Amino acid sequence: MQKIFNFFPLSIYKSSISLTDSEKKTMIDDIYEMEKNSKNVKYKTKTNSWTGDTQGFEFLHNNSNFDKLFKEIYKDIIEYLDNLDINHSKLNIFFQRSWATISRNGEKIASHRHSQSHISFAYYLKKNDKDSKLIFFDENKNNEIIPNLFDSPSVAIDGIIKKRGFLNAPIMTFPTEENDLVIFPSKTLHGTEKNMNDGERISISADIVLLAKDSKNLEHLSPSIDEWKLFSN
């Protein structure tokens, strides 16, 4: 009997966090105020979403109005690590940066990765069913037996790929709803489709760093920040 075996997956974690309308409104109003007080206005273009980390608001985890949300997210981060069979009791887990994004008609978040961290997430604070989707890009293309076979427009037009699926897709669109939380490795290339409606999507993202509590005999993993020393003159 013939069988296909699939190895080396990218595992994306999705959960849902329920907050009261009042709690969500407080955060949304806070985010609008941040947008109004943007520190880097020229960076924002007509086709790109507003991103708080580029506008001087990259530490939402230190804002008391977001405390409950980040406590709930922490629980899901632990669940995510459990699903990967990672012993998080040996790790110190830090929210490094966290920010809001606002996407309106004609705007998107360009493809990017978070190279400075280990785990990233997106929480959808405000979203409707017609909003653009999250996209993940496959950079490894382990099944691509011919270079550019999976992402060549001419190959697609010619019908050489009969059907797109998990075995041959260069990108995956990932549907989400309001209140959804999506967790993934920071190194994963991702972005969003262009928003094509008059709605408004507000999401919260963050970068998470994991350090070894005890680095004795470890070749890899960064040691506890308590052991670091700041350069000084």
Where are these regions (language model features)?
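Short beta-strand segments enriched in hydrophobic/aromatic residues
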Residues: 125, 188, 208-210
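Non-heme Fe(II) oxygenase catalytic core, chiefly the N-lobe of the double-stranded beta-helix
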Residues: 28-34, 68-143
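Non-heme Fe(II)/2-oxoglutarate
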Residues: 1-87, 108, 197-233
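Short proline/glycine-enriched turn/loop segments at secondary-structure junctions
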Residues: 3, 110-111, 193-197
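Histidine-centered metal-chelating micro-motifs
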Residues: 107-108, 187-191
